[in-house]
Amino acid sequence: MGQKINPLGFRLGTTQSHHSVWFAQPKKYSEGLEEDKKIRDCIKNYVQKNIRISSGMEGIARIEIQKRIDLIQIIIYMGFPKLLIEDKPRRVEELQMNVQKELNCVNRKLNIAITRISNPYGQPNILAEFIAGQLKNRVSFRKAMKKAIELTEQANTKGIQVQIAGRIDGKEIARVEWIREGRVPLQTIDAKIDYCSYTVRTIYGVLGIKIWIFVDEE
């Protein structure tokens, strides 16, 4: 059977870059990793509680963390940053305070920057959130998949593959359904592919959503 590898890790150093940039002593590495997890969870929870688009999406594509001895720089890539910036100017400061409290960083400065993404629906995370919202509202999975593909086509991507697994439409037996549009060359290392896996809780149980987007050839 085919051995499936994570498309992002497979391409690290060629078309993908790390989302965390820092160095640590081997003994302290796990602490740094845990700190990153806390930062990401804290930001996602804050956005989930305070800012939600009508469709129930957070709109975060990715969070990059850069650390130096005296500074932690966090860059949040958002598809819809207006929600965080224009709503209340103090929202970013409040988020910064929350993260600082969570980390308890006394002697390090913390900076949060928000960057807008030009094509939000070209990002697998945002698309997965969109599909999850549709499935929670009991929209048929085929409709949700097709709508997601339509949105991606507007973002000028070269190909997309969407897979949903679990008790689809509340059926007794779990199954896997997928749909592909355009090219998705998973074997080609030079192909820039974005990938995300996302779990969504519906009234029938947990569904897994996986999305591969072929952005461009390097």
UniProtKB/Swiss-Prot annotation:
Keyword Chloroplast annotated: yes
PROSITE patterns tied to this protein: KH_TYPE_2 (PS50823), RIBOSOMAL_S3 (PS00548)
GO CC, one annotated term: cytosolic small ribosomal subunit
Family: Belongs to the universal ribosomal protein uS3 family.
Compartments it resides in: Plastid, Chloroplast
GO biological process, alphabetically ordered: translation
One GO MF term: rRNA binding
InterPro entries the record matches: KH_dom-like_a/b, KH_dom_type_2, KH_sf_prok-type, Ribosomal_S3_C_sf, Ribosomal_uS3_bac-typ, Ribosomal_uS3_C, Ribosomal_uS3_CS
The keyword Phosphoprotein is annotated on this UniProt entry: no
Record's keyword terms, sorted: Chloroplast, Plastid, Ribonucleoprotein, Ribosomal protein, RNA-binding, rRNA-binding
Complex formation: Part of the 30S ribosomal subunit.
Source organism per UniProt: Arabis hirsuta
Span of domain KH type-2: 47-118
Annotated protein name in UniProt: Small ribosomal subunit protein uS3c
